[in-house]
Design a protein with these regions (language model features):
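Phosphate/pyrophosphate-binding active-site segments
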Residues: 4, 132, 168-170, 287-370, ...
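Thiamine diphosphate
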Residues: 95, 104-110, 250, 256, ...
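Conserved short loop/turn motifs at secondary-structure junctions
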Residues: 203-208, 340-341, 421-423
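Short, small-residue-rich loop/turn micro-motifs
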Residues: 24-25, 96, 159, 230, ...
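N-terminal cationic-hydrophobic initiation segments that often serve targeting/anchoring roles
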Residues: 58, 145, 219, 357, ...
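N-terminal alpha/beta PP-like core and its mobile active-site loop of ThDP/TPP-dependent enzymes
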Residues: 1-324, 359-362, 441-444, 461-464, ...
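Bateman (tandem CBS) regulatory domains
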Residues: 121, 336, 485-486
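Active-site diphosphate/adenylate-binding microenvironment
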Residues: 3-18, 23-26, 31-33, 333-411
């Protein structure tokens, strides 16, 4: 009879999950014993990087990725990254070793309350009742992670379970998509067909459901302006399309003003709505009807206004497109192109983003963790292909550096660029070592404004004055740090050096880091 370990690896092969992201400890060694030659183990030097790489890999493959962490301390180190995966709705199977069942009652060293620790930010958290249940629980975790709304699932596995005997699992498959109610889709189509001035808001659920281009067809049929929802972790509409109007602001008053004048607003794969600072105002103007489609029932339930339907966003979009008649409506005017920023030293963030955009490959995937520079990034860099833009939907830091490495390992032929702030880059800097070790040729561009400028902007917005400590970050040699972890790079301080340096980073054929020193301007939030 096979061991639990052998049965589990057979299961993972069948699921196509042969890459394991991990940082091993004593409670994980029994799982890694006799590691199969057809599997790949990707080592991260800290668990936040492990989980971030796994999330990027899952976003690249479209399937749940497997991460293996070291009991309670390792899971604790990874919880910030788990929160990001939860908000991004990225499917992950996260496992951790638990102490040996045979003396758990004595609470030996490394015994942990793992199931409870993971629970707030996973779709499910399990520990098998019996050793022979381990393969079935991992299969359950995989299908739970993949079922909409997708997300991370945690399994705690006692270290002595792996050598126990287990019966082979019976054949079992799950269809993970759930269609929205067809009557609701017909009703929505009728309302949209009669609308005088409809608008569309797209969110990450559009991209997750593979409907990036389908959303374009729907918007064109409606001749409706399209906005990206606030703080979206994925781009969901081609941003060079004439119907695209930009990103909605994450504040009630300003968002409602942006959507004013539209009698119907169709929100696809996004909350209604995601805000950040409290700015009182209506959700939308009183005359505006909101139609909401999301794969997440909680997202639909907490919406403040409108009519919601739960189901696969891509299926809903295709259903609406088929039902809607063509309209004779003048499309809205396209956005004005941004002004070309001036070349100067110190460089402005606008100039840096404009220069990156001028040489960025059309099929590049960009991982953005710029915080204070995000508005300028969206002004100059447009994403018109699926999988082109990734950021954290949780608002925390530390995802994009390891996320870009994991994505590159999943999609090795696609150019990957990580644009990251100086403060952000230090949260999961260990990912640079993994990039070098596994040949993930990501171009890392560190925007160095020598501080937490986004917090300075928030400080100014709330009138906190100038005596707020902890907002300056100086004295870090980012190129030196990268070289110490095996990644070459260079410092860029002069505007004339920027373009050739970016070209070198993009064409290096290996991971490469640019530290770009910019004017430490403080952004004006919600201006």
């Amino acid at each position: 009879m096979a061991t639990v370990r052998e049965a589990t690896f057979d299961l993972l092969r069948g699921l196509g999950t042969t890459t394991v992201f991990g940082n091993p400890g004593s409670t994980e060694l029994p799982f890694l014993k006799d590691f199969p030659e057809d599997f790949r183990y990707v080592l991260g030097l800290q668990e936040a990087s492990v989980l971030g790489m796994a999330e990027g890999f899952a976003q690249g493959t479209g399937r749940a990725a497997l991460a293996n962490l070291h009991t309670g301390p390792g899971l604790g180190n990874a919880m910030g990254a788990m929160i990001t995966a939860w908000h991004d709705k990225t499917p992950l199977v996260v496992t951790a070793g638990q102490q040996d069942r045979r003396h758990r009652s004595l609470e030996p060293l490394l015994t942990g309350k793992l199931v409870d620790l993971a629970k707030p930010y996973v779709k499910g958290s399990f520990e098998p009742v019996r050793a022979e249940d381990v393969p079935g629980e991992i299969r359950r975790a995989y299908h739970t992670a993949m079922q909409q709304p997708q997300g991370p699932v945690f399994v705690s596995i006692p270290m002595d379970d792996w050598d126990a005997e287990a019966e082979p699992l019976e054949d079992h498959h799950v269809i993970h998509r759930t269609a929205p109610d067809p009557d609701a889709i017909r009703r929505f189509a009728g309302i949209l067909g009669e609308a005088r001035s409809p608008a569309v808001v797209t969110g990450a659920g559009v991209e997750r459901s593979g409907a990036f281009h389908d959303a374009t067809m729907l918007a064109e049929k409606l001749a409706a302006p399209v906005w990206q929802d606030p703080i979206s972790p994925l781009a969901s509409f081609p941003q060079d399309h004439p119907l695209f109007q930009g990103h909605l602001p994450p504040a009630q008053k300003q968002l409602a003003e942006r959507l004013s004048g539209h009698d119907v607003v169709l929100v696809l794969g996004a909350p209604v709505f995601l805000y950040y600072p409290y700015v009182p105002g209506p959700t939308v103007e009183g005359y505006t009807q909101v139609l909401h489609v999301s794969e997440d029932p909680e997202e639909v339930a907490r919406a403040a206004v409108g009519t919601g339907v739960v189901g696969d966003v891509g299926l809903a979009i295709r259903g609406l497109t088929e039902l809607l008649p063509g309209v004779d409506r003048e499309p809205p005017p396209a956005q004005e192109p941004p002004l070309r920023p001036e070349a100067e030293t110190p460089m402005s963030v606008a100039y840096v983003m404009h220069t990156i955009a001028s040489v960025l490959p059309e099929d590049a995937a960009v991982f953005d963790e710029t915080a204070s520079s995000k508005a300028k990034l969206h002004t100059y860099i447009r994403f018109d292909r699926p999988g082109g833009y990734h950021t954290s939907g949780a608002g925390g830091l530390g995802f994009c550096m390891p996320g870009s490495v994991g994505f590159k390992l999943a999609v090795p032929d696609r150019p990957v660029v990580c644009i990251i702030g100086d403060g952000s880059s230090m949260y999961s800097v260990q990912a640079l070592w993994s990039a070098a070790r596994y040949g993930a040729d990501v171009a890392f561009i560190v925007i160095n404004n020598r501080g937490y400028s986004i917090l300075k902007g928030f400080r100014d917005a709330i009138g906190a004055g100038d005596r707020v400590p902890g907002l300056d970050v100086e004295g870090i040699d980012f190129v030196g740090v990268a070289r110490g972890l095996g990644v070459d790079g260079e410092l860029v301080e002069e505007d004339g050096d920027l373009l050739p340096a970016i070209k070198r980073a993009l064409n290096a054929g290996r991971p490469y880091l640019l530290e770009v020193v910019v004017d430490p301007e403080v952004p004006k939030l919600l201006s």
